[in-house]
Amino acid sequence: MALTQERKTQLIQEFRTHENDTGSPEVQIAILTENINNLNGHLRTHKKDHHSRRGLLKMVGQRRNLLTYLREADVQRYRSVVDRLGLRR
């Protein structure tokens, strides 16, 4: 299922760093994580959907790059995002 506008707004409000923030790494990582989780559920039922699998791998790579950037820029913000999203178990 695609990410609804309400859920996206909710994620932005939860992870933003200031009032008008929609593009900070934290927000982007949260939205990508939500999309990745949704696509994982889709791929569990549609195992042969290789086009979607390629999109999933692209999103995972993009999230990894954003996490690397955030870790190098500010370790505290990185740890906060990882803990809040439940990544890196």
Swiss-Prot record:
Gene3D superfamilies: 6.10.250.3130, S15/NS1, RNA-binding (1.10.287.10)
First and last residue of the signal peptide: none
GO biological process, any: translation
One Gene Ontology cellular component annotation held by this UniProt entry: cytosolic small ribosomal subunit
A Gene Ontology molecular function term of the record: rRNA binding
Entry keyword annotation includes Isomerase: no
Record keywords, A-Z: Ribonucleoprotein, Ribosomal protein, RNA-binding, rRNA-binding
UniProt-listed Pfam families: Ribosomal_S15
Keyword check for Transmembrane helix: no
Family of this protein: Belongs to the universal ribosomal protein uS15 family.
Oligomeric form and interacting partners: Part of the 30S ribosomal subunit. Forms a bridge to the 50S subunit in the 70S ribosome, contacting the 23S rRNA.
Function: One of the primary rRNA binding proteins, it binds directly to 16S rRNA where it helps nucleate assembly of the platform of the 30S subunit by binding and bridging several RNA helices of the 16S rRNA.
Protein's name according to its UniProt entry: Small ribosomal subunit protein uS15
Annotated gene: rpsO
